């Protein structure tokens, strides 16, 4: 049997905040400066910004509406003892990801009674933060994708 036909096709779950952008022309986000051109959001600006539309990019829209695509929960005694260090790793991971992918951003890092809660505008950043925590500090990582919605819940525990 042909190997390319032997694969099961998985349904695609796309970010609902991106659906409206597939037919748009050149656009600049007035809040963050990201540019939409040729079907992609970038930090490189537009070739011809004179005819560009202005609209919030999907990341700025998620931030304004407080609708995260990812949540990371950090729990355990280690978290309370190393909050600044963990926050630094989270921010550095965001800077690296955001440099190439403008829609992957931190929304908030919040203190909670049993640890930290981090929200992101994209699935990939949440997953990448989880893997960075596990690689740097070991601990127990659990990543749960919502099968119906564009959302990921990441749990990291270290006592």
Report each predicted region and the residues it spans.
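Long C-terminal interaction/binding lobes of large macromolecular proteins
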Residues: 2, 6, 21, 28, ...
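Short hydrophobic/aromatic beta-strand micro-patches
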Residues: 119-121
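Short aromatic/hydrophobic contact patches that present stacked aromatics
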Residues: 71, 115-117
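N-terminal cysteine/histidine-rich coordination modules
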Residues: 1-65
């Amino acid at each position: 049997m042909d190997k390319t036909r032997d694969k099961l096709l998985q349904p695609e779950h796309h970010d609902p905040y991106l659906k409206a952008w597939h037919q748009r022309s050149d656009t600049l986000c007035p809040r963050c400066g990201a540019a939409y051109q040729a079907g992609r959001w970038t930090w490189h600006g537009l070739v011809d910004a004179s005819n560009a539309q202005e609209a919030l990019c999907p990341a700025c829209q998620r931030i304004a509406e407080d609708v995260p695509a990812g949540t990371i929960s950090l729990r355990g005694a280690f978290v309370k003892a190393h909050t600044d260090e963990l926050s630094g790793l989270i921010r550095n991971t965001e800077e690296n990801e955001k440099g190439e992918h403008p829609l992957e951003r931190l929304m908030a890092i919040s203190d909670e009674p049993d640890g930290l809660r981090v929200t992101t505008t994209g699935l990939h950043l949440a997953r990448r933060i989880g893997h960075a925590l596990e690689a740097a500090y070991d601990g127990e990582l659990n990543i749960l994708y919502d099968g119906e919605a564009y959302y990921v819940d990441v749990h990291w525990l270290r006592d």
